């Protein structure tokens, strides 16, 4: 199953900028969540892995927890589609949860525990 690429008229630079803003917003969400709910723990950080040819993998990591890592989401490089993680290596291809080129950089579809489910 493949999810069609949506040509929304954005350049690669605009998609890259949207990705930076998306990750920045996610890290702000994480910091605020840990500050209010878990003040004694160090917050998790979202980092981008550039290894994939098709997707950026967003990894949630907490250094103080022995380097615990999990996949937060995937973002498709071609159009900035935000995809929920199906596994460590692959995104769920049933539907895009938003785009990093949206006006809110796709943050309305992101929570502190991961990308929102489809409704």
Regions found by a protein language model. Give the residues of each.
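Short, non-transmembrane alpha-helical segments in secretory-pathway proteins
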Residues: 4-41
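Long, terminal "pre-/pro-" and other extracytoplasmic accessory regions
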Residues: 2-17, 87-93, 100, 118-119
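Accessory DNA-engaging acidic/polar modules
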Residues: 51, 57, 100, 106-112, ...
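Small/flexible residues
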Residues: 59-64, 78, 86, 118
């Amino acid at each position: 199953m493949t999810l069609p690429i949506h040509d929304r008229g954005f350049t690669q630079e605009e998609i890259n900028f949207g990705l930076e803003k998306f990750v920045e917003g996610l890290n702000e969400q994480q910091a605020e969540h840990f500050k209010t709910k878990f003040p004694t723990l160090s917050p998790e950080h979202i980092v981008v892995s550039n290894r994939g040819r098709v997707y950026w993998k967003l990894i949630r990591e907490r250094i103080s927890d022995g380097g615990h890592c999990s996949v937060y989401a995937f973002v498709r490089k071609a159009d900035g589609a935000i995809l929920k993680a199906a596994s460590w290596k692959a995104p769920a291809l049933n539907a895009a949860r938003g785009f990093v080129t949206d006006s809110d950089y796709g943050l309305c579809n992101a929570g502190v525990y991961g990308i929102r489910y489809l409704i």
